[in-house]
């Protein structure tokens, strides 16, 4: 899980979602997981 000030989809499998008011990227590739904060 990468924590970044701005999250962007890296590949076409990445999805940007909101969970508990946090913007996150979920993907098949675990290295693409990101959370804003």
Swiss-Prot record:
GO function terms (MF aspect): structural constituent of ribosome
Domain of life: Bacteria
Pfam families assigned: Ribosomal_L36
GO CC annotation, single: ribosome
GO BP of this protein: translation
Keywords for this protein: Ribonucleoprotein, Ribosomal protein
Family: Belongs to the bacterial ribosomal protein bL36 family.
Official protein name in the record: Large ribosomal subunit protein bL36
Originating species: Nocardioides sp. (strain ATCC BAA-499 / JS614)
Gene, per the UniProt record: rpmJ
